[in-house]
UniProtKB/Swiss-Prot annotation:
Gene3D superfamilies: 1.20.1270.10, 3.30.30.30, 3.30.420.40, Actin, Chain A, domain 4, Substrate Binding Domain Of DNAk, Chain A, domain 1. GO terms for cellular component: blood microparticle; centriole; cytoplasm; cytosol; extracellular exosome; extracellular region; ficolin-1-rich granule lumen; nucleus. ATP binds at residues 14-17, 73, 204-206, 270-277, 341-344. Residues 616-643 are annotated as: Disordered. Induction: Only at higher temperatures, and no basal expression. This is Heat shock 70 kDa protein 6. One of its GO terms (molecular function) is ATP binding. Residues 396-511 are annotated as: Substrate-binding domain (SBD). PANTHER family: HEAT SHOCK PROTEIN 70KDA. Changing K563R: Complete loss of in vitro methylation by METTL21A. The modification N6,N6,N6-trimethyllysine is found at K563. Belongs to the heat shock protein 70 family. The N-terminal nucleotide binding domain (NBD) (also known as the ATPase domain) is responsible for binding and hydrolyzing ATP. The C-terminal substrate-binding domain (SBD) (also known as peptide-binding domain) binds to the client/substrate proteins. The two domains are allosterically coupled so that, when ATP is bound to the NBD, the SBD binds relatively weakly to clients. When ADP is bound in the NBD, a conformational change enhances the affinity of the SBD for client proteins. It comes from Homo sapiens.
Amino acid sequence: MQAPRELAVGIDLGTTYSCVGVFQQGRVEILANDQGNRTTPSYVAFTDTERLVGDAAKSQAALNPHNTVFDAKRLIGRKFADTTVQSDMKHWPFRVVSEGGKPKVRVCYRGEDKTFYPEEISSMVLSKMKETAEAYLGQPVKHAVITVPAYFNDSQRQATKDAGAIAGLNVLRIINEPTAAAIAYGLDRRGAGERNVLIFDLGGGTFDVSVLSIDAGVFEVKATAGDTHLGGEDFDNRLVNHFMEEFRRKHGKDLSGNKRALRRLRTACERAKRTLSSSTQATLEIDSLFEGVDFYTSITRARFEELCSDLFRSTLEPVEKALRDAKLDKAQIHDVVLVGGSTRIPKVQKLLQDFFNGKELNKSINPDEAVAYGAAVQAAVLMGDKCEKVQDLLLLDVAPLSLGLETAGGVMTTLIQRNATIPTKQTQTFTTYSDNQPGVFIQVYEGERAMTKDNNLLGRFELSGIPPAPRGVPQIEVTFDIDANGILSVTATDRSTGKANKITITNDKGRLSKEEVERMVHEAEQYKAEDEAQRDRVAAKNSLEAHVFHVKGSLQEESLRDKIPEEDRRKMQDKCREVLAWLEHNQLAEKEEYEHQKRELEQICRPIFSRLYGGPGVPGGSSCGTQARQGDPSTGPIIEEVD
């Protein structure tokens, strides 16, 4: 029997929700997780006993706010001192600490203090998506295309790639979210001739605008713009602040210091925001929000729009910039395509429609799933899928920011202009600034400003051993090379000696080293093993409980009441009571202890039931063993809630 063909998946790793898709038999399928949901919250929670990822983590966030981590995408590839990180920390209930200038989240897991890099948290979400795909496909998944906001810089892309590696994935390609959405939009519109499309992607935490031309399977990005720190969560924050102020006004109490109350309020605000996309008013009802005070209030759509008006309006600036860079007039755009959950907000749609002079917006693709859909198609292309639908699909993306180096006087000398099609390679020759200079210090920047101090330093390296010569004589050739992932490497070569030095940009040592990634891969496997052990433990506990209640139930049955001798009945009842009392005090026992208790109970019950039935049977025609196995997750669902 031949092995199943290896499949690659497309993963939309979102700020608030993630989504996974696969392309097979000529079509994309978006895969539902173990809760039946096609999107999974990008949440990871740590408790005294286990680690939770996705829906399970988000649903217990109010009970465990300090150890429930979300928004890793707003930390990934950034420095701790970054102003956005500092302002976000005010809203997060979990702690963020600095380690070597990099942010790490600090949580309490199994009674110990632990710190995790954002890449590790994101890798846990990616592992969950990988497991979702494996459960659906029935085979291991090793390869993936992962999406990032178009405006993510080099270090954020590198860090996302590292997160994939920690999750045990071979990241085939990092692609831009709006480009992936454009594939989802354009795949079934092959015969329509060349069309200029503007993708407006407003998600939970990031905002991108991309202008593309789509023609016969060629998707060419003309320009991209955006804000890596604008999305639905910022609208939630405005609502939270509004209601916190209202609570203080009405009840004279400040709940800003209570993480649990804030989490409950935030959840209610998120729900109200969604309601306001379809209704003009939303009601919040939170029992005993803070110090026993119930909070019942409402908000109108108009008030919500006023609270967020500056944020909504700010989405138009990147639209104008992308059109300018693409050298297109708004009248030349054939389709304006909405992507991301926040584009459901009526005011956002109205502002955009008015900007395009009343043009009808295109809502034909699912805003929550389009990015994963496009990523799945690109994954199939990179795996060499022969389906005619994707065979001649070509993706031409761009570098979102200009790249260059610092020359004398702190001037930014650009080698790669923003919106240059990638992959790309540019070479320029530089020379020394002073006589007999033994080396050159090359500092690489990204950004659009004339002076490097106003741009973002990506990395620095030295080319030494230049033979003594007057200034201006040595020739140093510098090459900037961007690969298809949008990741940059820079080489400097001294022409006279042929000596070279190279750097793959690491955002001022912000990137994880190979050893660190390997260590995290090992730790991820360890956490997975711990999670499985916890699942087995819970299954053994449920199995024991089910068995006890089955025995107790059998003793109550009319048909058996008179057949069991009083002494045997008492023996079984006493044992059941003993096991239940033991369970009460041993909620966190090991799997083996539960199994031992179950065996002891079986040793008492089996001979009695055997005598009764003249064989190994128990009531209902099932043996003790099968009855007990009902708690086993492999034979059926457990419907018992486990705290």
